[in-house]
Amino acid sequence: MGIPEKASEGVYTYGKGNVYVVRQDPKEFVMNERGDATLLKQVEHAYGQLEYKNHFYLERGPYVMAAVLDENAISNEPLQLQGHYIDLFDPKLPCMEVVKVNPGEQAFLFDIDAVKDAMRPQVLAAASRQYEEKVGERSFAFTAKSPANTDNVMRILLPKEPKKVKVAATYQSEWDAKTRTLLLQFENQPEGVQVEITW
């Protein structure tokens, strides 16, 4: 970066941006009352106007993580998300169009609208690993493996409503037309459970 190791406090240009050198022990920002004021002023100077929120929101591919703080210094409003989500914290993997995250709560979601190649059948969430996936013109087959004496709940994205579902175990299924996802539930087997879906 070309900045001397013992450079004095200040702003140094690097590439298309800047580097701020702060010669202060980071623990002082949290140990002293209002110790963060200096750091916040520097951040505001670097980025312009700061926007304070009571939540953290992070997207990584189709995964969404959100947490709302209950330290109502900023706001005690819940975070509300709209779209088509699978709630990954709920073992029943429900589909939701509106997700409300209250102060003191967290959410871990799968954003169905963010799926690439949404017309290709694929398992979006499951309590198993899928092997030997085979995608046909009007079919999708795979083997689901997971430890014995555990229940499998999975949400599968399909191009159309299934006409036939074959599972090598007793199962329950439910179609969600808005998200084009099939909810499948059955008991796991370590040697695998074969699933075949046709539409």
Over which residues does each language-model region extend?
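A conserved amphipathic helix/loop scaffold
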Residues: 1-137, 154
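Structural motif
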Residues: 60, 136, 176-178, 189
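Hydrophobic, well-ordered secondary-structure elements that form the walls
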Residues: 66, 142, 165
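Short proline/glycine-enriched turn/loop motifs at strand-loop junctions of beta-rich domains
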Residues: 71-74, 80-83, 147-150, 157-163, ...
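Solvent-exposed beta-strand/loop surfaces of large extracellular or lumenal domains
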Residues: 82-98, 166-185
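Beta-strand-rich interaction surfaces with strong enrichment in secreted/lumenal proteins
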Residues: 96-99, 131, 142-144, 183-187
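Proteolytic processing hotspots in large secreted/extracellular or virion-associated proteins
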Residues: 135-152
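Surface-exposed interaction regions enriched in Ser/Thr/Asp/Glu
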Residues: 187-199
